[in-house]
């Protein structure tokens, strides 16, 4: 059995704020070590539970955070930030399941460091359904008929996953106090929880169905200001919804919608003031 792991950072236990997840800030090296250790707990249990291959995709920021020299020796790692499918790079229909580790809640909702890709996004929608990174990534997995078996992160990410994916296993390694304060498990306790939940998720795999994306989905992105919407609207095929900061794109399938999101958010970041 092949298992796919997408590993973000904001949902890792013990990381309360951006000083742990920004490579230019003081706690980053501590954060990436804990991130690597959490990934290893899940990888080790995946192999113990019968997986024959585990592919890990570093899915945070520049996507070169996981310490390959400390990673489980049997895992394969995708690292680096120029990826056609970003947080779900390398995922295809050869995988039996996916695991999302270190995930956080979507923008405009409570949760530790909650956001959706960039600071300027208020909401993502697929058709009329609000989604965050978790939802978009789960839809791409569903496009390949791959179920998301487990989501680990803060309590709000776990709740978001449970509302989105029936029977998904969740592992809440920290509880939200505010967007930059948490009650967290120690690394050892988090490791035990992740080990137990990974084992259960793999045992439970036949009860979880893929999150099937709609045919020809409409991607809508609500930005924080009109300047960001104007930049995103430079992508061919988009339009700004009248009287809003929402940019829409009619996609031929979920893969095109996902890549449109990547381009639109990249363009929106060119806005120099709010």
From Swiss-Prot:
Zn(2+) 1 binds at residues 8, 10. GO terms for molecular function: aminopeptidase activity; metal ion binding; metallopeptidase activity. Keywords: Aminopeptidase, Hydrolase, Metal-binding, Metalloprotease, Protease, Sporulation, Zinc. The active site is at residue 115. Binds 2 Zn(2+) ions per subunit. Its cofactor is Zn(2+). Its EC number is 3.4.11.-. InterPro entries: DppA (IPR033824), DppA_N (IPR027476), Peptidase_M55 (IPR007035), Peptidase_M55_sf (IPR036177). Induction: Nutrient deficiency conditions, which also induce sporulation. This is D-aminopeptidase. It comes from Bacillus subtilis (strain 168).
């Amino acid at each position: 059995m092949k298992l796919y792991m997408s590993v973000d950072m904001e949902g890792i236990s013990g990381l309360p704020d951006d000083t742990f997840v920004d490579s230019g800030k003081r706690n980053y090296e501590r954060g990436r070590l804990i991130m690597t250790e959490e990934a290893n707990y899940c990888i080790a249990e995946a192999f113990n539970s019968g997986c024959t291959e585990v592919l890990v995709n570093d899915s945070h920021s520049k996507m070169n955070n996981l310490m390959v020299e400390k990673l489980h020796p049997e895992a394969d790692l995708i690292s680096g930030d120029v990826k056609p499918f970003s947080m779900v790079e390398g995922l295809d229909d050869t995988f039996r399941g996916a695991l999302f580790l270190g995930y956080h809640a979507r923008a405009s909702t409570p949760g530790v460091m909650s956001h959706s890709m960039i600071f300027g996004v208020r909401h993502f929608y697929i058709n009329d359904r609000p989604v965050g990174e978790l939802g978009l990534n789960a839809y791409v997995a569903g496009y390949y008929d791959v179920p998301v078996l487990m989501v680990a992160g803060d309590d709000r990410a776990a709740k978001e996953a449970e509302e989105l994916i029936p029977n998904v296993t969740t592992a809440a390694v920290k509880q939200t106090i505010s967007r930059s304060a948490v009650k967290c498990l120690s690394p050892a306790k988090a490791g035990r929880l992740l080990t137990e939940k990974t084992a259960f998720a793999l045992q439970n795999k036949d009860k979880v169905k893929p999150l099937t994306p709609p045919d020809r989905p409409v991607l809508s992105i609500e930005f924080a200001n009109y300047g960001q919407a104007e930049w995103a609207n430079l992508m061919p095929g988009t339009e700004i919804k009248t009287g809003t900061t929402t940019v829409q794109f009619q996609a031929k399938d979920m893969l095109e919608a996902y890549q449109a999101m990547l381009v639109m958010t990249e363009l929106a970041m060119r806005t120099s003031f709010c």
